[in-house]
Amino acid sequence: MEAKTDAPISPAPTTNPPAEAGKEPNASSNAQANPTAAPGAPPSGAIAVGQSTNPVAQQQQQPAVAKKPSSETNNMPTRQYLDQTVAPVLLHGMQALARERPTDPIQFLASYLLKHSNGCDENNASAAAVDNNS
């Protein structure tokens, strides 16, 4: 968290040094050496933090674009979302758990959910076929 608090602070102090750097004779050589950093920026660590925040900001913007297709699920109510996505697979997993009664029920349910999380409709059809055969 400290990196996040340092990132917004580092650009603010660098806005004042350019005015002071103009009074210094070596200000132009500093500006040419570090074009992305302010001429009077104190430590190079602050520059690295400032530069690392730009890719982080870009990465934060990119997932927002990637999440737009899933906005359909974000717009539906929580109950409806859970009923459509989680409940069917979880229900079948709980039924299998009750039938088999394994010694480690949490591990059994976790592995069941991972195995059957791809397609709930396919699982419903196969579970119905297994129940009919029994």
Curated annotation (Swiss-Prot):
Positions with biased composition (Polar residues): 71-81
Family per record: Belongs to the dpy-30 family.
Function: Component of the SET1 complex that specifically di- and trimethylates 'Lys-4' of histone H3 and of the MLL3/4 complex which also methylates histone H3 'Lys-4'. Inhibits MTF-1 transcription factor activity.
Superkingdom of the organism of origin: Eukaryota
Keywords: Chromatin regulator, Nucleus, Transcription, Transcription regulation
Entry-linked Gene3D superfamilies: cAMP-dependent protein kinase regulatory subunit, dimerization-anchoring domain
Region (Disordered): 1-81
Skewed-composition ranges (Low complexity): 31-68
Pfam families membership: Dpy-30
Localization (cell): Nucleus
Record note on quaternary structure: Core component of several methyltransferase-containing complexes. Component of the SET1 complex, composed at least of the catalytic subunit Set1, wds/WDR5, Wdr82, Rbbp5, ash2, Cfp1/CXXC1, hcf and Dpy-30L1. Component of the MLL3/4 complex composed at least of the catalytic subunit trr, ash2, Rbbp5, Dpy-30L1, wds, hcf, ptip, Pa1, Utx, Lpt and Ncoa6.
Expression sites (tissue/organ): Expressed in larval brain, gonad, imaginal disk and salivary gland and in adult brain, testis, ovary and salivary gland.
GO CC entries: MLL1/2 complex; MLL3/4 complex; Set1C/COMPASS complex
CDD domains, alphabetized: DD_DPY30_SDC1 (cd22965)
GO biological-process terms attached to the record: chromatin organization; heart development
Record protein name field: Protein dpy-30 homolog
InterPro entries, A to Z: Dpy-30_motif, DPY30_SDC1_DD, Sdc1/DPY30
Phenotype caused by lack of the gene: Viable and fertile with no overt disruption of metal homeostasis.
